[in-house]
């Protein structure tokens, strides 16, 4: 009489689910593992630094784009439609930094 043994294919399908169940069980038993003993504070600090950097970069890019557009219109006699792509790009960069700031706070 043969006993049923799991094949390698069925074991490879079940293994990820078993590992996930094990991780969830350990996290439920030991909630301090989920908080990583202060690791969340480190992540928040790092993300705040990234947000500050993005804000500074976006302010710089928007300022340079406005100065460049003004110079081109004043001294090179460019039409407004000639500088719209640059101003639009600056608007997108500035908005992206602010949207990221809004989403991460």
Swiss-Prot record:
Give GO cellular component annotations, separated by semicolons. plasma membrane
Q: What keywords sit in the KW lines?
A: Cell membrane, Membrane, Signal, Transmembrane, Transmembrane helix, Virulence
Description of what induces expression: Specifically induced within macrophages by phagosome acidification. Induced at 37 degrees Celsius in minimal medium, suggesting that nutritional stress is a regulating signal.
InterPro entries (alphabetical): TrbC/VirB2
The question of whether Thylakoid is a record keyword is answered with: no
- Its membrane topology, per UniProt? Multi-pass membrane protein
Q: Which domain of life is it from?
A: Bacteria
Described by its record, this protein's role is as follows: The VirB system could be required for the establishment of the replication niche in the host.
What's the further remark here? Transcription of the operon is maximal in early exponential phase.
Q: What is this protein called?
A: Type IV secretion system protein virB2
Q: Which organism is it from?
A: Brucella suis biovar 1 (strain 1330)
Query: What taxonomic ancestry is recorded?
Result: Bacteria, Pseudomonadati, Pseudomonadota, Alphaproteobacteria, Hyphomicrobiales
Q: Which gene encodes it?
A: virB2
């Amino acid at each position: 009489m043969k006993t049923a043994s799991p094949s390698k294919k069925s074991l490879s399908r079940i293994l990820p689910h078993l590992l996930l169940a094990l991780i969830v069980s350990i996290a439920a038993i030991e909630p301090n593992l989920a908080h990583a003993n202060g690791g969340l504070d480190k992540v928040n600090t790092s993300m705040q630094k990234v947000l500050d950097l993005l804000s500074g970069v976006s302010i710089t890019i928007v300022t340079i784009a406005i100065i460049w557009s003004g110079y081109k219109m004043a001294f090179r006699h460019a039409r407004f439609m000639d500088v719209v792509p640059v101003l639009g790009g600056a608007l997108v960069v500035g908005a992206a930094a602010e949207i990221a700031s809004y989403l991460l706070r």
